[in-house]
Amino acid sequence: MADLYVGLVHYPIYNKRMNVIAGAVTNFDIHDISRTCRTYNVQGYYIIHPLEVQKQIIDKILSYWQEGYGKVYNPDRADALSRVLWQPDIASAVQTIVERTGKQPYVVTTDARIYPNTVSYSFMRKQLQEGDRPVLLL
């Protein structure tokens, strides 16, 4: 079975005017997605953002729940948040997976549109169930 990793990309993204922007990290991005990742045994959850100020926000929230009063108050949350890693860009997230597993991951992005390199759900399910190459879902 292949290892699954999730990455939430905050840059580069498009706003409603189709300008490239960096989105802000939210509490939801950190807490809720990390709990879902824990539930489905995702090996790592990367919050991808290039701005140092956003990394500081992520670090502060993680520190509270993993080292501060939050860890005592809700130890399950600390466990879920242990999968969260900040990376400045997608290439850095891919590199950490290569270093961890020794294998180049499939990088899969979601989109409602169909492209020439679009793969089916059944193809990716088979890769996860039968493959040994990690998958990074963005």
Regions found by a protein language model. Name each.
Residues A91-V98, T118-L128:
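A short, acidic, amphipathic alpha-helical segment used as a generic capping/interface helix at domain edges
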Residues M1-A112:
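RNA substrate-binding interface of SAM-dependent RNA methyltransferases
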Residues R125-L138:
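A glycine-rich beta-strand to alpha-helix segment
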Residues N15, P116-V119:
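Short, well-ordered, mixed-charge alpha-helical segments that flank or form enzyme active sites
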